[in-house]
Amino acid sequence: MAYFIDRRLNGKNKSAVNRQRFLRRYKSQIKQSVADAIRRRSVSDVESGESVTIPRDDISEPLFHQGSGGERHRVHPGNDHFVPHDHIERQQGGGAGGGSGDAGNGEGGEDDFVFQISKDEYLDLLFEDLALPNLRHNHYQQLTEFKTHRAGYTANGVPANISVVRSLQNSLARRSAMSAAKRRELHQLEQQLDALQHSEPVQPLETIRLRQEIETLRQRIARVPFIDSIDLRYKNYERRPEPSSQAVMFCLMDVSGSMDQATKEMAKRFYILLYLFLSRNYKNIEVVYIRHHTQAKEVDEQEFFYSQETGGTIVSSALKLMDEIIRARYDPAQWNIYAAQASDGDNWADDSPLCQQLLTTRLLPLVRYYCYIEITRRAHQTLWREYEGLSQRCDNFAMQHIREPQDIYPVFRELFARQVALR
């Protein structure tokens, strides 16, 4: 009876290793496809993966084949029209097909390659090369980052990570184990043959039998493969959580009457993207949500994204509340403080200079990074004009403009592109 042993470690995902190698090989094309996809779908729609399209030309492999010219020697079935060594003229152009459709005037081609990536793969590509700017590693407490480290060996992987020494050690151990009993038996038979050859009288038949058994055993030992897939070992790498400085992100959103529903929706999408980025890359980071119209209020996540409350516009109320919360709960000596403010830029005229003053004197000296996102299809408003001077003077202040939903992801990547961490 024959037994089949499945040594694959991937279970149902039998091509997981090949899949990861494919994702690494065509990373730039896949990232471009994901960037295009985020413009078509809702930012909050991350429960499913994404269909990724790669142009066929990008995955084509070099191919050696015979050219269209030259002289070839071939053997064809014989018939009554040709005899050996006849020269057959090559047909010019392609042959006619048997289909009934009309011919087109374009060149033939192949469809682009389309495949599905999972939710985790989608988010990994979405947030790759992004990080909190100016993160200072000065107080090891709650925030956890993940870094790649060597983690021993694994039985599957890519050829580039193969460990030759460990694989040969496993091969030697396996061959020794599989042939140990046969070698002991071979040693006994060789001793018997040696004793028989020195004994009287000579027994030729027994000598022949022992030599045949010895030869059979040697062949069986030689058939043990030198290397087997079960011997292969690959250097393993894993992402380990590493403690680093604790951080807090302040999310300030304008919900005044000047913010129409479409503008509020774009602001929510930006903050949802920010929330996904923080929760996926930083395990224990704290997030403070502040909504404001004429008055500012600290709210929870549910109320921040879904409350219908609205009113007039006094942006400074949110900045004052943020300043109060920082001084009450988040010591800048122990916390990395970040803020993201989203607004349509429409503010009470006398309040915009006060906002600039609050940022300059109270908030920017305390925060690692402050970003302002103005969401409007109109010309820039008073708040933008007041903030422009800050962006030129302060390295930890950034401004971006969102006009359409398609701008959300490019603006997000621009604001949170990975930088060298401060020490």
Curated annotation (Swiss-Prot):
Membrane-spanning intervals of the chain: none
Biased amino acid composition, Basic and acidic residues: 77-90
Biased amino acid composition, Gly residues: 92-107
InterPro entries in the record: UPF0229 (IPR006698)
Residues covered by region (Disordered): 40-111
Pfam families given in the database record: DUF444
Homology family: Belongs to the UPF0229 family.
HAMAP family, sorted: UPF0229
Name of the protein: UPF0229 protein NT01EI_1636
Record organism: Edwardsiella ictaluri (strain 93-146)
Organism classification: Bacteria, Pseudomonadati, Pseudomonadota, Gammaproteobacteria, Enterobacterales
